[in-house]
């Protein structure tokens, strides 16, 4: 059994598979790519009142190794899933490892706009997950950027926590459904700013101001806020299996109902690479557990290891 991905989905799979005696190999990458690695305080993971994202990942890595997983800090560069055993190409020397079962848990990446100040203030007032980092916005003036259903949903969610929410759209109309648009328009704590884009994020140790450019007039207006959330979409990291397993139009791996099975026997998916709805660490970990149990049973029935 090979697991590709070093986030909570892949690591939970490694823990369960290790405890089942499968001696799984898990590829964590040269640098662990879990979004938790760029998260400061995690306050919604059961068992921890608060924990730093990298510390949570390291705890899971240590537990996976303790349970018998073999850790490879290398990138997987190619997967040949056309026939069993599957071929996994990895590392600088393009070595090939074969396996009878594969759990793919490479996650997704939140899209950002790479404006001035974004990197400097990432997790210091700037985030791409309102549910994960809502405490950044507590009793603060907050910005949400985006015009789709997710942006409207997150603006509505944050309106219960922030003192005020500015919803910034590049266009003069929403892409969201009529019901979601009505929800934000009728919310007295949400102010909608049309035809605009964030030009720069400013602050000292944390965000305290952004510059907003009107895309029609070109005027730039300062806006005093202390939190900003990008809600402009996610990109699933599934290119290694593109054309080999069934995916959605947006590139998310499709799994069979109530399981982590893909349409290819012996290949399972877990975490955000197959979840475009919840995108939470605890959900990813749960799906990693399911994937390991599915893989264990599948291997037992198909004579693999």
Swiss-Prot record:
Its cofactor is FAD. It comes from the Eukaryota. It catalyses: [thioredoxin]-dithiol + NADP(+) = [thioredoxin]-disulfide + NADPH + H(+). Keywords: Cytoplasm, Disulfide bond, FAD, Flavoprotein, NADP, Oxidoreductase, Redox-active center. GO terms for biological process: removal of superoxide radicals. GO terms for molecular function: thioredoxin-disulfide reductase (NADPH) activity. It is found in: Cytoplasm. FAD binds at residues 28-35, 272-281. This is Thioredoxin reductase.
